[in-house]
Amino acid sequence: MFLRGLGCIYLIAILSWWIQVGLLVGENGLQPASRLLEFVGKNFAAEGRPGFWALPNLFWITGASDFALNTACFAGCGLAILVIVGRFVGPALAGLWVIYLSLVNTGGVFMSFQWDILLLETGFLALFLCRWEAKTTWADPPPLTPVNRVALVFAWFLIAKLMFFSGWVKLAWSSEATPEWWTEGSAMTFHYLTQPLPTWTAWWMHQLPAWFHKASLVPMYLVEMVLPFAVIFGRWGRLVAAFGFSGLMLLVLLTGNFTYFNWLTIVLCLPLVQDRLWPARLRSGLSFVPVGLTAPMARRPLLLRSALAGPALLGLALVNLHILVRDLHQAPKPFLKADLSPGWLDSFAAVVSPFYPASGYGLFRTMTTERPEILLEGSADGTNWLAYDFAWKVDKISERPRFVAPHQPRLAWQFWFAALEGRFDYRSSNAGWFESLVLKLRDGDREVKRFLKYDPFPDAPPRLVRARLMRYEFTTPDERRATGDWWKRVVIGEYLPEVSRPAAPTANPDGGGPP
């Protein structure tokens, strides 16, 4: 069930990226992947090293053309379907991991989210949990091999690591520079408002009294910081942990748009539950195992496969050890006062980190108490300004917040991060795509208009484009009854000054053409 669920997550993640890849990192996208590869390649060539080791991906070979990007997404979807139906599961998972690693490492800021890294870590671990026979059928699970058993322990550790550090960072990363919203119990009073893409249910949750928000932290910390230790207390401890983790993720699903992350976390809970504990009908319909040992790969001696997997799992253990020591030491309120990671381990982790075999996690380490939003506007005359309305982004105050997960509209997410910066900054990681977006809107680019729900300039591009920073708040129930609006907003100030189109060449007085 775990592998089948992972195949579904891969399919969702790749499909979600595919429908926007050209607009974001295609040849004419906001941040072309080809430029990223060119930049990294030149920098590393100057150091006498291939850029592959900084950004391992297939597009060093094929080039990051639109055709190559779309072909990778198409192949990834096909391989995910093979995993779901139980055919060539091992090779398909290996191909999926390579393809998604390539997409992440060429996606720039649009692919820099913790769940993308979590999917890669999960996908890498799945290579040691799956069977590599070519043919499969529905049946009861066979006995686990030694490699499977070790990998299963790693799977238990992964979900425990994810959940524990999600709770621990909320407490350990509070400092004078980062107010103690979590430790003082006020974080949930503004979480529903300030999350990147709110939902209409978040509006309702935001209206609840402060005591409720503070009380809701108790079960959250119980699930995130206590239940991870239940993983070591036998199958019933793992069963309790699985239901606790899954229950928390379902509650988050009901109030937020956190892409496929919640579903991936639920899938990660499946190895905690023994297959025999599932109803027989469900087990027979959702599990797959190999048929006999007829495929060529199945004839490989178990000893050989264990010999190949052993060093990889040892390396995985070392990287996880490095991450644990680093995270427990580097927090403002560290658990470890000294860095206990030896230099050779730091070097090893640095070499393999671009492949994301293991990572540290910690969602909502810091919180924002207000909701700034960037409002892009265009004008034909410099006096009358009309606002652009972007798909899934908070713009119109009258529009009800919607559910979009498990799809991730990544431009809408990046707008949220850019707004937190307060003002356009050329040194920011968001500067490149934002500048490109403004110029494309100014020039009336047809492709970029696919990001829009409403284009105020359908016939001719504006002469000027600007960006203002707004502060959005949820309306109160009384305000919504009176106005019908879900939001209210005020102007904070300028985010980006007016950007104009170059003046068209004018003819010389003597009619001799442009001067």
Go through each PLM region and give its residues.
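Alpha-helical membrane-anchoring segments
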Residues: 1-515
